[in-house]
């Protein structure tokens, strides 16, 4: 974090602006909106600022900047056309430990101005830390289009009702759930349609009913996808933003975790084939206990919870204890990682089916049907199989799969560190030996297309259209690699 985001209350506070031209006028306009007492140090003012001075909306000092000007002000903005003067202002302000901004000179600023979406009292600031102002402006434009003009009205009405809600609903959790329901329900729709009187009646009715409603806990099983935060579903994002507590495993990426509601408790219940693990029974018991405490629990799992994620086992436990639950599917690793590696799971010329199998089974599980897995013209994807790659290759060859069958090991799928090692079934063990976990094994003729179709990360064979990726990032407002590249 290059800059700490903070909103300052400038109402009635003295702010010094050095300069009397168009640049200074733009900053002064914003300061006046915030209620600041603006003082302008300049020998001459342009027409716009002269009019403001004549109306006593700003205090014109009518002289060049002097060091004494900064002593009694809250913050300083240097916006003159004289670069040397601006930098002098900066150094003097720094010596007095006063916040100072030199317009268009990031190296001489103790604070910077973000792009702002104003839905007063709702304000959203967007900043690139001064690195890419145009990108920040484009993001602001996208957000402006997404956010309804009625957002400010919604905030104002909510502010008027805040004390009443606090008096009726005693716990923080109850109040948070109440407001989440209103902002996603009929109240919000009425405000959007400018029916504010009806909206307040709706709010009153909902508040009256709120204490009668069952506020018991629940569990939502959410698939986090293969890693890239941009692949998290909208429903999944909503769930982790509304959770009281999130139980997550080792396959959930940092990018996904950064989207979890900040006040939510996070509990790691991870497991990996090579390392320690949280017993599944302990995780099941924890979900039940937290839900019975009345908390909204999200069980966040890498990939899809019903594809080798033990999601079914966890839901059986919840059903047995009569805990309300829901499921949000996610993009499973076999789909996400192969797509990012440029390996289509099916192809009319090479594979008419795709089979997913796990290399990590229960001790008493029946043996795998190797004859079925060794069939040609199908794509075989093996989860958690890196430790058993030699055995897998041996058994498939014993049951008729050619040692020349293309094979790949994809590590850190869909993440910036993704690596795709390709070879054949004959050297699969060597490919897997050096692959960092989590790794996915892909076997089949479609792997041969990787060389031609790879588009992401270090294995990409050709340049993508940067403009397309930038547009996709801004259009989706995602947090995946496309946005990082932009």
From Swiss-Prot:
Residues that hold NAD(+) according to the record: 22-23, 43-44
Any single Pfam family the record assigns to this protein: NAD_binding_7
Catalytic activity: uroporphyrinogen III + 2 S-adenosyl-L-methionine = precorrin-2 + 2 S-adenosyl-L-homocysteine + H(+); precorrin-2 + NAD(+) = sirohydrochlorin + NADH + 2 H(+); siroheme + 2 H(+) = sirohydrochlorin + Fe(2+)
Function: Then it catalyzes the NAD-dependent ring dehydrogenation of precorrin-2 to yield sirohydrochlorin. Finally, it catalyzes the ferrochelation of sirohydrochlorin to yield siroheme.
Molecular function, one GO term: precorrin-2 dehydrogenase activity
Region (Precorrin-2 dehydrogenase /sirohydrochlorin ferrochelatase) residue spans: 1-203
CDD domains reported in the protein's UniProt record: SUMT (cd11642)
Organism name: Neisseria meningitidis serogroup A / serotype 4A (strain DSM 15465 / Z2491)
Binding site for S-adenosyl-L-methionine: 226, 302-304, 307, 332-333, 384, 413
InterPro entries: 4pyrrol_Mease, 4pyrrol_Methylase_sf, 4pyrrole_Mease_sub1, 4pyrrole_Mease_sub2, CobA/CysG_C, NAD(P)-bd_dom_sf, Siro_Cobalamin_biosynth, Sirohaem_synt_dimer_dom_sf
SUPFAM superfamilies, per database record: NAD(P)-binding Rossmann-fold domains, Siroheme synthase middle domains-like, Tetrapyrrole methylase
Protein name: Siroheme synthase
Residues the record lists as Phosphoserine modifications: 128
Known pathway: Cofactor biosynthesis; adenosylcobalamin biosynthesis; precorrin-2 from uroporphyrinogen III: step 1/1; Cofactor biosynthesis; adenosylcobalamin biosynthesis; sirohydrochlorin from precorrin-2: step 1/1; Porphyrin-containing compound metabolism; siroheme biosynthesis; precorrin-2 from uroporphyrinogen III: step 1/1; Porphyrin-containing compound metabolism; siroheme biosynthesis; siroheme from sirohydrochlorin: step 1/1
UniProt GO BP: cobalamin biosynthetic process; methylation; siroheme biosynthetic process
PANTHER family: SIROHEME SYNTHASE, SIROHEME SYNTHASE-RELATED
């Amino acid at each position: 974090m290059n800059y700490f985001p903070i909103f300052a209350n400038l109402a009635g506070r003295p702010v010094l602006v050095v300069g009397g031209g168009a640049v200074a006028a733009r900053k002064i306009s914003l300061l006046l909106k915030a209620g600041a007492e603006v003082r302008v140090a300049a020998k001459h003012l342009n027409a716009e600022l002269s009019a403001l001075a004549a109306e006593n909306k700003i205090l014109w000092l009518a002289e060049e900047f002097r060091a004494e000007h900064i002593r009694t002000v809250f913050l300083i903005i240097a916006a003159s056309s004289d670069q040397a003067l601006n930098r002098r202002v900066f150094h003097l302000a720094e010596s007095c430990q006063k916040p100072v901004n030199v317009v268009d000179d990031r190296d001489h600023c103790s604070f910077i101005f973000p792009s702002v979406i104003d839905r007063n009292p709702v304000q959203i600031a967007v900043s690139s830390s001064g690195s890419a102002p145009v990108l920040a402006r484009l993001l602001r434009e996208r957000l402006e289009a997404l956010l309804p003009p009625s957002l400010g009205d919604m905030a104002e009405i909510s502010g008027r009702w805040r004390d009443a809600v606090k008096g009726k609903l005693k716990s923080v959790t109850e109040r948070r759930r109440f407001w989440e329901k209103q902002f996603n329900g009929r109240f919000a729709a009425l405000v959007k349609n400018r029916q504010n009187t009806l909206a307040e009646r709706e709010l009153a009715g909902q508040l009256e009913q709120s204490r009668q409603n069952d506020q018991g806990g629940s569990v939502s099983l959410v698939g986090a996808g293969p890693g890239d935060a941009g692949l998290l579903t909208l429903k999944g994002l909503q769930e982790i933003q509304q959770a009281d507590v999130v139980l997550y495993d080792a396959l959930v990426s940092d990018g996904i975790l950064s989207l979890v509601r900040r006040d939510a408790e996070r509990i790691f219940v991870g497991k990996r084939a090579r390392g320690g693990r949280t017993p599944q029974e302990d995780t099941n018991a924890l979900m039940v206990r937290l839900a019975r405490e009345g908390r909204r629990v999200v069980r966040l799992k890498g990939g899809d919870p019903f594809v080798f994620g033990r999601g079914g086992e966890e839901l059986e436990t919840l059903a047995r204890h009569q805990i309300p639950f829901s499921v949000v599917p996610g993009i499973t690793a076999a789909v996400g990682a192969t797509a990012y590696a440029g390996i289509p799971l099916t192809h009319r010329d090479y594979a008419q089916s795709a089979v997913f199998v796990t290399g990590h089974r229960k001790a008493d599980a029946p043996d795998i049907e190797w004859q079925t897995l060794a069939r040609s013209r199908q794509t075989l994807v093996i989860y958690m199989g890196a430790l058993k790659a030699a055995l897998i290759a041996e058994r498939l060859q014993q049951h008729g799969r050619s040692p020349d069958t293309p094979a790949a090991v994809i590590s850190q799928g869909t993440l910036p560190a993704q690596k795709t090692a390709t070879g054949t079934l004959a050297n699969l063990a060597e490919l897997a030996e050096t692959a960092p976990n989590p790794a996915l094994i892909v076997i089949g003729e479609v792997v041969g297309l990787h060389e031609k179709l790879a588009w992401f990360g270090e294995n990409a064979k050709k340049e993508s259209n940067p403009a397309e990726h930038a547009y996709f990032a801004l259009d989706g407002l995602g947090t995946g690699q496309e946005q990082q590249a932009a």
